[in-house]
């Protein structure tokens, strides 16, 4: 009788341990899925030669705004495939020019997404221009092609962050970093920090 009771009790204990382990694993995977779910956000990728702004919706839809008219999208897709899969993203809609959607608007390299404004600077279009009241944008995205200084852009824009793209030469990157520090501007260098995501 005692032997039977021992084995029955042991089987019951093992069953409880097994069920608890399954529950724990299920909770762990559910938590990981919840943490990795798509969230409304902006992503700037550390992909040299292909500057882009990725606008992501919480349902997995997204728009990837290429800065160059002939982008190296194959390189970007190859380097970001695991990230997109990890966060359960659908294939993004590719944008290379001005557009207008319900939540996304792009006009003359100024991208507006869920009330957040990003100005892409990849040429000298904004040099030597002034305005009575600077336009407020959250992110000033500096890419290869702009030869001026930050001071010129502060006459036109008021911004929270400067994003330095990986396409910038080392000389230009160090120069712009120095200007940011001197002006007390917050900046992120993608070459140093890697890709960054901002939740909206």
Placement of each model-derived feature along the sequence:
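A structural signal for short secondary-structure junctions
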Residues: 35-37, 46-47, 134, 156
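Transmembrane helix-bundle segments that form internal channels/tunnels in multi-pass membrane proteins
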Residues: 1-45, 52, 57-58
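Extracytosolic and intramembrane catalytic regions of membrane-associated proteins
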Residues: 54-200
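Extracytoplasmic
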Residues: 39, 48, 104-106
């Amino acid at each position: 009788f005692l032997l039977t009771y021992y084995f029955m009790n042991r089987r019951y204990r093992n069953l409880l341990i097994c069920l608890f382990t399954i529950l724990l694993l299920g909770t762990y995977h559910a938590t990981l899925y919840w943490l990795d779910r798509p969230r409304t956000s902006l992503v700037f990728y550390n992909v040299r030669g292909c500057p882009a702004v990725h606008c992501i919706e919480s349902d997995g839809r997204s728009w990837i705004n290429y800065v160059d008219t002939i982008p190296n999208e194959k390189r970007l897709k190859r380097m970001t495939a695991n990230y997109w899969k990890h966060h359960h993203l659908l294939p993004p809609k590719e944008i290379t020019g001005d557009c207008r959607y319900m939540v996304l608007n792009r006009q003359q390299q100024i991208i507006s997404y869920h009330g957040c404004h990003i100005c892409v600077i990849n040429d000298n279009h904004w040099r030597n221009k002034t305005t009575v009241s600077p336009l407020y944008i959250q992110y000033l995205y500096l890419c290869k092609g702009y030869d001026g200084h930050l001071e010129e852009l502060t006459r036109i824009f008021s911004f929270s962050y400067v994003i330095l793209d990986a396409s910038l030469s080392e000389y230009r990157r160090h120069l712009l970093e120095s200007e940011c520090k001197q002006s007390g501007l917050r900046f992120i260098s993608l070459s140093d920090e890697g890709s960054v995501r901002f939740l909206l």
